[in-house]
């Protein structure tokens, strides 16, 4: 459960990056593929060497989903249920990869927002994104 202050931190950070989902998402994917190359197996549709347009497109979709989660943080299960079904039943993404995505996204936030991304904001985002990952893994059986 997020506190009022944590919710405020999440919303404040999202307001700073909203509208920039594509470049932030592309950078997240580049970092993910560089640091954790084994994750590329879940992005076969991007090919072995995805071009910038592919990264921007998929990165935008990923972060738009995060934006929806931010908008409906009180109702994550209902909002993310279709995405959880997709990842568990269709894409069959190993849920151990979600923390890797979370880590890379937080690095992207920190590198762009620098001093604006405080320790408290990072902690709130870590808690929030971990909650998102929990919801996404609930459909695995």
Swiss-Prot record:
Which GO molecular function entries does the Swiss-Prot or TrEMBL record give? heme binding; metal ion binding; oxygen binding; oxygen carrier activity
Residue ranges occupied by any Globin domain in the UniProt entry: 1-141
Residue sites binding heme b per the record: 58, 87
Q: Write down the PROSITE patterns for this protein, in alphabetical order.
A: GLOBIN
What gene is behind this protein?
A: HBM
GO BP term (any one):
cellular oxidant detoxification
Q: InterPro entries given for it?
A: Globin, Globin-like_sf, Globin/Proto, Hemoglobin_a-typ, Hemoglobin_oxygen_transport
Q: Which Pfam families match?
A: Globin
Write the record's keywords in alphabetical order, separated by commas. Answer: Heme, Iron, Metal-binding, Oxygen transport, Transport
Q: Which GO terms describe its cellular component?
A: haptoglobin-hemoglobin complex; hemoglobin complex
Q: Which family does it belong to?
A: Belongs to the globin family.
Q: Which SUPFAM superfamilies match?
A: Globin-like
Q: Which domain of life is it from?
A: Eukaryota
What CDD domains would the database entry show?
Hb-alpha-like
Write down what this protein is called.
Hemoglobin subunit mu
């Amino acid at each position: 459960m997020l506190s009022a202050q944590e919710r405020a931190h999440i919303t404040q950070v999202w307001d700073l990056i909203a509208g920039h989902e594509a470049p932030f998402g592309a950078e997240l994917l580049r970092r993910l593929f560089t640091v954790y190359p084994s994750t590329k197996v879940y992005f076969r549709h991007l090919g072995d060497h995805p071009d910038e347009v592919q990264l921007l497109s998929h990165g935008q979709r990923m972060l738009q989903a995060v934006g929806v989660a931010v908008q409906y943080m009180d109702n994550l299960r209902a909002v993310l249920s279709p995405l959880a079904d997709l990842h568990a039943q269709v894409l069959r993404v190993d849920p151990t990869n979600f923390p890797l995505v979370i880590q890379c996204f937080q690095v992207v936030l920190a590198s762009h927002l620098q001093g604006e991304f405080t320790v408290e904001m990072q902690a709130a985002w870590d808690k929030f994104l971990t909650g998102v990952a929990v919801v996404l893994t609930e459909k695995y059986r």
